[in-house]
């Protein structure tokens, strides 16, 4: 399993789509010579860039086809959603992402692994000596944040995602979670002083049985 985060930058770095595809095929062949089944190529899809320098493909589905992707996923909800309020409710962002999932699952040829995002607050990465006001059009890390991302709401989206995955007998049985320890982006599963083990407990309660 090999996941490529910034696919346009990967292609650009190798010189062309054709060159990138050849490099992927060479690694795939090398894995098979080593006795493996080959490389499962997972490509991250972006709707809008978040970090400075990130690039977005104009046609994600075509890019995946031309590179021979085995699957795709997303890194975080906010690359596919909007944060209209300075403090945007978690459940609103969840519903936007679920609508995005409904769209791409019919557009992409390869299976799409849905993402579950714990939260989003990049304000710790701002200049702490200056006022932070956020704003719908503000650049990272001065963008709006997500609130109400409680363990209970996180558990709810885990249940929703599990139900959707199991409802499709031919669909994937995989998902991604953002994130284990992005403390300065407000998205972390690790135990903390506010909720303790609650996020991990929610994950265990939904998928541990």
Enumerate the predicted regions with their spans.
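Glycan-processing catalytic domains of CAZymes
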Residues: 1-209
């Amino acid at each position: 399993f090999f996941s490529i985060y910034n696919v346009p930058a990967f292609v650009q770095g190798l010189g062309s789509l054709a060159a990138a595809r050849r490099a992927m095929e060479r690694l795939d062949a090398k894995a098979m010579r080593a006795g493996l089944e080959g490389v499962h190529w997972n490509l991250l899809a972006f709707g809008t860039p978040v970090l400075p320098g990130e690039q977005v493909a104009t046609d994600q589905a075509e890019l995946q086809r031309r590179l021979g992707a085995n699957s795709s996923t997303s890194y975080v909800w906010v690359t596919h959603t909007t944060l209209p309020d300075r403090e945007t409710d978690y459940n609103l962002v969840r519903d936007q992402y679920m609508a995005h999932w409904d769209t791409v699952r019919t557009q992409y040829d390869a299976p799409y692994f849905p993402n579950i995002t714990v939260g989003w607050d990049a304000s710790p990465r701002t200049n702490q000596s200056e006022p932070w006001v956020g704003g719908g059009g503000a650049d990272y890390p001065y963008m709006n944040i997500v609130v109400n991302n409680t363990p209970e709401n996180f558990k709810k989206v885990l249940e929703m995602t599990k139900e959707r995955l199991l409802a499709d007998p031919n669909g994937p049985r995989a998902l991604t979670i953002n994130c284990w320890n992005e403390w300065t982006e407000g998205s972390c599963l690790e135990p903390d002083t506010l909720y303790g083990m609650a996020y991990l407990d929610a994950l265990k309660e939904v998928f541990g049985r």
